[in-house]
Amino acid sequence: MLEKYKNSKKLSRDLPQINDRIKFPKVRVIDDEGEQLGIFAPEAAIQLATKQGLDLVLVSDKSDPPVCRILDYGKYKFTQEKRAREAKKKQHNSSIKEVKMRYKIEEHDYKVRINQASKFLQSGDKVKATITFRGREIQHSNLAINLLNKMAADLVTIAEIQQAPSRDGRNVIMLLSPKKVN
């Protein structure tokens, strides 16, 4: 029984507060041109809106009295959704790309890894540089740390070290993130 009540409460909260759903004793009304009309009872404000063929939409319930606007709700909803889509387009979800190598890497192979990392960083992704060891190679972890420091120095113009080179089991890992452009 209680669960059913909670769900119905949630549904009513999700619905937009327009026209008859506005349950405040007094509301501040703004017309479709942005001019303040004054403080009205919701019923009077709804009548004012219906005369113009528009809706009364609650814009801000935080202020005292709550602010309502007279506008076309369909158009308002469309513009809100359009803004949300635009904001989502501009948003870039950065992911972590990994560049793996061994501590005994040749110069050309190293340059290829640097180019890969720079492409990832320029596209806004973070780069996890990993150097793996096999067998007794783990004794040379200082060489791997030096190699990762060299990599960070080579990418200093486009990247900043987020996590310094550190041992993680049979690997040495460093995390680079793209530099923020101001």
Swiss-Prot record:
Q: Which residues form a coiled coil?
A: none
UniProtKB keywords:
Chloroplast, Initiation factor, Plastid, Protein biosynthesis
Pfam families in the record: IF3_C, IF3_N
Enumerate the Gene Ontology biological process terms.
ribosome disassembly
InterPro entries, alphabetized: T_IF-3_C_sf, T_IF-3_N_sf, Translation_initiation_fac3_CS, Translation_initiation_fac_3, Translation_initiation_fac_3_C, Translation_initiation_fac_3_N
UniProt subunit comment: Monomer.
Q: Which NCBIfam families match?
A: infC (TIGR00168)
What protein is this chain from? Translation initiation factor IF-3, chloroplastic
Q: What is the species listed in this Swiss-Prot or TrEMBL entry?
A: Porphyra purpurea
Gene encoding it?
A: infC
